[in-house]
């Protein structure tokens, strides 16, 4: 991969993320870098398969080099630090090819994390409102503000009806079809990057072909007893590997890679080799 330059983030970025639940970085990857990511993505996908929904995923072993490249990229690290603080922990790099519509959903309806989780999505194909770009409801992540201020836990969530992707649309919330729910489209070109928490309500409709996405996922370092218990519970739900840091990160000469895994190791998550 070509050398990647750093791009600083300001307090405004943090406040924007906190208010609306997402950040958009246009052209964060150069055309040359994007072509390299596309080639790596396609190689990874050759190792995987498609599920019943037509979603293609690569294997963990096949993503090892891409994982290393992106986790050590200062731009990914800057975004994670801006949102989660300087002790963010690495979760995963995933390659996914979406071939069908993705219904409205957000993690907080079904799988709640006591620590904040950040998804940084790199899009490799042109996507607009007519071809399956991400649609979001700005501010809908505020259900997760309960993590920052317990008073939020007392507030009702008027959007709960569409947080579960398995909602039965035969009797749609508010009498609206899923495509009619008010939204903001986040149209992207290859090399653009979106950052958002899984608590943000999002979907994609009008898909006209595979939507190639690379996601880099980070976790706020669990500190409280509740957060630590919750992290271990999610790791168990994820087959015991979800939060196990890569061995090559733990042993790396790069201090930034060691730093984004040391917290999980200290909590007893055993490193895993590919």
Name the predicted role of every residue range:
Residues 6, 22-24, 119-123, 183-185, ...:
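Conserved hydrophobic/aromatic beta-strand scaffold that supports enzyme active sites
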Residues 131-201:
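Double-stranded beta-helix
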């Amino acid at each position: 991969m070509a050398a990647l330059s750093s791009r600083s983030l300001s307090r405004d970025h943090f406040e924007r993320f906190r208010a609306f639940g997402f950040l958009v970085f246009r052209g964060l990857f150069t055309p040359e870098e994007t072509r390299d990511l596309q080639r790596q993505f396609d190689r990874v996908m050759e190792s995987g398969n498609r599920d019943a929904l037509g979603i293609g995923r690569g294997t963990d072993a096949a993503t090892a080099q891409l994982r290393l490249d992106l986790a050590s990229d200062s731009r990914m690290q800057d975004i994670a630090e801006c949102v989660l603080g300087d002790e963010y922990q690495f979760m995963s790099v995933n390659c996914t090819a979406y071939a069908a519509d993705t219904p409205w959903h957000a993690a907080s309806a079904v799988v709640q994390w006591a620590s904040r989780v950040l998804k940084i999505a790199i899009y490799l194909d042109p996507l607009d409102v007519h071809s399956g770009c991400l649609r979001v409801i700005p501010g809908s992540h505020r259900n997760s503000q309960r993590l920052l201020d317990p008073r939020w836990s007392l507030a009702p969530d008027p959007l709960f009806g569409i947080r579960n992707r398995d909602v039965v649309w035969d009797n749609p919330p508010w009498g609206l079809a899923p495509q009619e729910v008010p939204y903001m489209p986040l149209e992207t070109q290859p090399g653009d990057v979106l950052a958002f928490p899984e608590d943000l309500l999002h979907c994609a409709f009008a898909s006209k072909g595979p939507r190639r996405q690379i996601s880099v996922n980070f976790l706020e370092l669990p500190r409280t007893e509740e957060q630590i218990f919750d992290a271990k519970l999610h790791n168990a739900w994820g087959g015991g590997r979800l939060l196990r840091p890569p061995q090559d990160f733990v042993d790396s000469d790069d201090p930034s890679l060691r730093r984004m895994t040391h917290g999980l190791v200290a909590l007893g998550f055993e490193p895993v080799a590919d």
